[in-house]
């Protein structure tokens, strides 16, 4: 038995200079797991609660000492002596101790940090890599694939201080034969984009996720510049590389309309979907995330109707990694893909349940970071362990992003042909 003998919580810093929660789970025999909770900027209103202290005299109210206290007190007391390999039991105990719908007593950040740390401790106890242990928990032992990365090379919206409304413009190296090759392609395009921006006298400062954040005349201009950068790097758009957008449309949804203030345009729900469809006809965009507000279900139905057979439509704020909300989407034919973020739901067990539900319904799965990240690379192992097929973890810049890519390189090296890179086949509507 992987008996838990101690749990330690602490306050650490995330990639935006804000506090976040880290936890250690210690087992008999000297085994230990450590994990940190990430934090989002554009957040869905139905996400599990990230517990902050609210003390304006300390970290502008963003301290997490209450969450840390919950780890060192209530959570530690509840889990002492339990078996770390019994992940579902541990997570359920924490959920029961919390006793609220959205984890606002203990904090999803506290529960998640302990949940992931316990999984890492259990993997250490079993003497296996984390991805192997997660695959066991998922009921898919030995079944792996390497994810196609969504690389956020140009930032707007809440992730950058510029006038670009769409939050993320991403490249997916679908023509690569391996993850290692995909990473190289993305890095070359990233550096190519920097030189293109410089040649136009545009800013090469970066946003929260490491993508460039220039002021541009329109959102379409961002796509045009990326096209130039892809070709300058020696690749063909549409075959070697496809494009992906994260609109984060909830951030510019006002009074029932979509306000692209950066270019002075206002759209109805159907009008904005038509606008996005027109972009897919001009550029090889294979995936669009949060193309409408999280509450605009009628708009989502229209968007899915006009694009869902050819374009991957990813629900992030729409589904918030929540099986109850995802089931409603599946039942109503809304979107065709889900973005998976640990901290939206708050435990590993609930995360795996959302992945299984999506896959069983024929939805694709994209494992994702948050804009406020740490060096914790657990999402890399999760993507491989569940054969998710896609991962979204930022640009080829900033070590909080690159840490995940580097972990994927290590995993691919270990697994070799046991973890194929399937390219375009992983993206809904593109196979």
From Swiss-Prot:
Annotated signal sequence range? none
Q: What does this protein do?
A: Catalyzes the reversible conversion of 2-phosphoglycerate (2-PG) into phosphoenolpyruvate (PEP). It is essential for the degradation of carbohydrates via glycolysis.
InterPro entries from the UniProt entry: Enolase, Enolase-like_C_sf, Enolase-like_N, Enolase_C, Enolase_CS, Enolase_N
Q: What is its EC number?
A: 4.2.1.11
Binding site residues for Mg(2+)? 246, 289, 316
CDD domains referenced in this protein's UniProt entry, alphabetically = enolase
Keywords of the record:
Cytoplasm, Glycolysis, Lyase, Magnesium, Metal-binding, Secreted
Q: Catalytic site residues?
A: 209 (proton donor), 341 (proton acceptor)
Gene3D superfamilies on file? Enolase-like C-terminal domain, Enolase-like, N-terminal domain
Q: How is the cofactor bound?
A: Binds a second Mg(2+) ion via substrate during catalysis.
Gene Ontology molecular function: any one: phosphopyruvate hydratase activity
Q: What is this protein called?
A: Enolase
Q: Which cofactor does it need?
A: Mg(2+)
- EC class, as a word, reads lyase
Q: Which gene encodes it?
A: eno
Determine if Metal-binding is one of this entry's keywords: yes
Q: In which family does this protein belong, per the annotation? A: Belongs to the enolase family.
> Binding of (2R)-2-phosphoglycerate: at which residues?
167, 341, 370-371, 392
Q: Which reaction does it catalyse?
A: (2R)-2-phosphoglycerate = phosphoenolpyruvate + H2O
User: To which species is this protein native?
Assistant: Shewanella halifaxensis (strain HAW-EB4)
Give the UniProt subcellular location, in the record's own words.
Answer: Cytoplasm; Secreted; Cell surface
**Record's Gene Ontology CC terms?**
cell surface; extracellular region; phosphopyruvate hydratase complex
Q: Which domain of life is it from?
A: Bacteria
* Entries under HAMAP family matching the protein: Enolase (MF_00318)
Q: Which Pfam family name is an example for this entry? A: Enolase_N
Q: In which pathway does it act?
A: Carbohydrate degradation; glycolysis; pyruvate from D-glyceraldehyde 3-phosphate: step 4/5
Q: Which GO terms describe its biological process?
A: glycolytic process
